[in-house]
Design a protein with these regions (language model features):
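Cell-surface/extracellular proteins and modules involved
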Residues: 1-60
Length: 60
């Protein structure tokens, strides 16, 4: 799954929308090599991890 960043998008809001929990924002950052999550650029295409990938990251 992919998401094209628009003005006003925040990683925590995207995590809530796609992963069900805002506090999983770091998984989207890790999956997309984002080092400065407050600096999302409109037009950037983010990869959204699958539920399986998210679970694997949570379990270590």
């Amino acid at each position: 799954r992919f998401h094209t960043v628009i003005e006003g998008d925040r990683v925590d809001l995207l995590a809530h929308r796609y992963l069900g929990q805002a506090d999983l924002w770091w998984i989207i950052c890790d999956y997309n090599d984002i080092f400065f999550p407050m600096e999302l650029t409109p037009g950037t295409i983010l990869r959204i991890p699958s539920a399986e990938h998210t679970l694997m990251r949570l379990l270590g």
